[in-house]
Each structure stands twice: as structure tokens, then as C-alpha cells.
Regions:
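Substrate-recognition/cap helix-loop segment adjacent to the acidic, metal-dependent catalytic center
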Residues: 107-125
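Conserved non-catalytic scaffold segment of RNase H-like nuclease domains
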Residues: 2-109
């Protein structure tokens, strides 16, 4: 058995002219980074995954997101798209059939599924 512990960072829209948060109701939070570690059955780290994601919906980093994460627009501007990073993340996760996904809280799972759905990507392995 393997465990994959992952964490997502996501961005949201911000209108500088109006100085307020704006969002796309289909995808209010856009994933801009996926980080993960893979553990064996004895909880030893056996692999890591980390990738920024180039924003397609909210191209500028929301001021609050930047303050909380330290991520700047320059960090993500040349990153691969979400579909590309998601494909690589699925490969990272899917090395064994009995892999357990672990995450801090339910927010990351909800937003991962919402981003997958927004881009119409397959979520079953």
C-alpha cells in the first residue's frame, strides 16, 4: 500500500479597477500549484511531486492568494496548463492499485474535482 499526501494552492479572480474579488461560477478557485509526497506502507517518503500551473481563468494572482502562498504571477506564467499537470499528477498517483489519497481538509478535494470538471478531464484511472 502507498499513500499520497497532496496539497493544492488555488487562485481566484480579482478586479483591480473595482478592487474586489470576482469569479467564474463554474470554477471559482483555479488551481495554481499541486504538491504531493508518496509514502510507502511504513510512511517513508518514496517520491515527491510539485508543479506550478499556468492560470487560464484568473491570470493575475489575487493579492490575498499572493500574500498567503508567496506565489507571484511570474512563478506561474510559464508553467504547464492544468490538463498537463493533472495528467502528470495522475501518473504520479497511479503507480499501484491500492494507493490512498490523503489531504488536509475537504476544500482541496472539492476544488480538484471542480477544476477537473471545468476542463472536462477524466478523473477515473
Amino acid at each position: 500500500m502507498e499513500y499520497v499526501v497532496f496539497d493544492l494552492e488555488f487562485n481566484q479572480g480579482f478586479d483591480k479597477t473595482l478592487n474586489k474579488t470576482v469569479s467564474n461560477e463554474r470554477c471559482p478557485f483555479e488551481i495554481i500549484q499541486i504538491g504531493a509526497i508518496k509514502l510507502d506502507s511504513h510512511f517513508n517518503i518514496i517520491d515527491t511531486f510539485n508543479s506550478y500551473v499556468k492560470p487560464q481563468l484568473y491570470k493575475s494572482i489575487h493579492p490575498f492568494v499572493g500574500k498567503m502562498t508567496g506565489i507571484k504571477s511570474e512563478d506561474v506564467m510559464d508553467a504547464p496548463s492544468f490538463p498537463q499537470v493533472y495528467k502528470e499528477f495522475k501518473k504520479f498517483v497511479s503507480t499501484k492499485k491500492n494507493t490512498v489519497l490523503c489531504v488536509w481538509g475537504t476544500g482541496d478535494l472539492k476544488e480538484l474535482f471542480r477544476n477537473i470538471t471545468y476542463y472536462d478531464l477524466p478523473y477515473k484511472t
